């Protein structure tokens, strides 16, 4: 009777799991079907199978978009912004979690202040950051995007870094200091290797966010030569029409690299997100 009850629970669990998988995969499969249709088919019968498979939609997307330039611009922003965001937030998180403050409330206040950004919508920041970039003379440049990208990731990075750093046994650091490690060696030789899953998780989340980011890019980029992949939809807009099949085909091509990147490193995401969540 017990085995029968367990088997029923398993069946229900797997049915729910299958339903969730279908729910998550269906939009991608639907987009793949739409990318093989004509614009008329997409507008008039979006749920039907394509009457004729049209791979030329992908060729048109390649001809319309300068993928090499857009990928270069995007990857450059991703690498620089992610590097400095991680550098600054790791140092601040290490100070909050591991260094002794005379006033404990001061460190907690600083920590909470850094976490405030999690609850601030990106669109609220557009106008203030636009004004700051304009006053600094960096509006329309890569630096004008790198600075806000670094800033908006501070709260999330601090949350993960501080949570993991507080879970590292103090004896590990004490032993390293007794062996002659200074603060720099303590971080690079002891702490960072232990935090590898957390670092990989933060790199992935920061990189994927910047790769897909649209509000800042669409507002601050004023030169087509600096366009990122998130702005490719503008290439398919006419004055009175829109190339839906071209947009969908290009979107799938742009999504593929980050999907592969995520699948390869997914085990680090799970271990990194759970790091610090369980004591002992």
Q: What is the role of each PLM region?
A:
Residues 1-280:
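A hydrophobic, multi-pass inner-membrane permease signature
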């Amino acid at each position: 009777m017990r085995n029968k009850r367990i088997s029923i629970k398993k069946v229900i669990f797997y049915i729910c799991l299958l339903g969730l998988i279908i729910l998550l995969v269906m939009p991608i499969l639907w987009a793949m079907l739409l990318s093989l249709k004509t614009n008329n088919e997409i507008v008039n019968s979006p749920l039907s199978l394509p009457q004729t498979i049209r791979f030329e939609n992908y060729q048109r997307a390649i001809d319309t978009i300068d993928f090499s330039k857009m990928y270069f611009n995007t990857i450059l922003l991703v690498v620089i912004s992610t590097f400095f965001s991680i550098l600054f937030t790791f140092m601040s998180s290490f100070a909050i979690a591991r260094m002794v403050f005379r006033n404990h409330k001061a460190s907690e206040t600083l920590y909470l202040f850094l976490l405030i950004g999690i609850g601030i919508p990106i669109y609220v920041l557009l106008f203030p950051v636009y004004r700051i970039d304009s006053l600094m003379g960096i509006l329309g440049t890569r630096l004008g995007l790198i600075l806000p990208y670094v800033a908006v990731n501070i709260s999330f990075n601090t949350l993960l870094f501080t949570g993991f750093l507080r879970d590292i046994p103090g004896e590990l650091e004490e032993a390293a200091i007794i062996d002659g490690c200074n603060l720099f060696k303590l971080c690079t030789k002891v702490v960072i290797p232990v935090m590898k899953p957390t670092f990989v998780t933060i790199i992935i989340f920061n990189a994927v966010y910047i790769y897909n980011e649209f509000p800042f890019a669409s507002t601050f980029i004023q030169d087509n030569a600096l366009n990122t992949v998130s702005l490719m939809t503008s290439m398919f807009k006419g004055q009175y029409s829109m190339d839906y099949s071209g947009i969908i085909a290009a979107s799938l091509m742009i999504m593929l690299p980050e999907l592969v990147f995520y699948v390869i490193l997914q085990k680090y995401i799970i271990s990194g997100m759970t790091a610090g969540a369980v004591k002992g």
